[in-house]
Curated annotation (Swiss-Prot):
The gene is bcsX. CDD domains: SGNH_hydrolase. InterPro entries: SGNH_hydro_sf. The keyword Translocase does not apply. It comes from Komagataeibacter xylinus. The lineage of its organism: Bacteria, Pseudomonadati, Pseudomonadota, Alphaproteobacteria, Acetobacterales. This is Protein BcsX. GO terms for molecular function: hydrolase activity, acting on ester bonds.
Amino acid sequence: MPAGVAAWRRDRRHAGTARPARCADTALFRTNPQLEKYEMNALLAGLTLLIIGDSHVTFKDSLLSVLPDEFTKQGAKVVTYGVCSSTAADWVVPNPNNGCGAAERVGDAPIGAPDMKPASPPPITSLIEKWHPNVVMVILGDTMAAYGQNAVSKDWVDEQVKTLTYAIGKTACIWVGPTWGQFSPRYGKTDQRATEMASFLKGEVAPCSYVDGTALLKQGSVNTIDGIHATPESYRVWGDAIVQATLPELEKLKDAPPAPAQ
């Protein structure tokens, strides 16, 4: 039994039946930090969350470190797959990456080195069949934003997104779009293109709900190592913002039954 509960019970026995003492003791019980910690840990109990995405969820000290840890602390069962350079349709139609990295993490298990062999993302339908998630969280956007090119092919992005959302089917989903970066010649990411892509995705990802990554953080606040991939500190800030933005919806969805097999 937590020490705070034991102390509360002793105080109740010695306090008699006076109403003020009971009210004061109850207030102490409700604000005990140790007990609040137990309540927080149960916030997402019963929820199975499947996270998929590109390089932002592939490497140690990226969102692969932040999101599974934080959602597991809230009581969720979390399974995460990241494949560097993957686009939305790659999670439906097999398309090997260039060997820049792939990762799988169950819960908050230790993060090992990514698999650097060229590999296709596992099909989303097989992942749903395997893990029976209540919710799929998609972390994608940068790989489809055509950074360094004159324009985004919106028809192509539309096809990419619709291919994935159709395959996700009746399973609830949350799509997290790109956030800010820094310009570098390597990728050519600009705030203007990030804003354009984030806004376009908002109207594309239904029936998934959408989290605009550029709305979570202040423009110019994200530090990167190469223009796109954030520093560990900025990944922590971005990840924490994603958690806070999605917790209310995840809490509502935790009691929803997993979608039937398609």
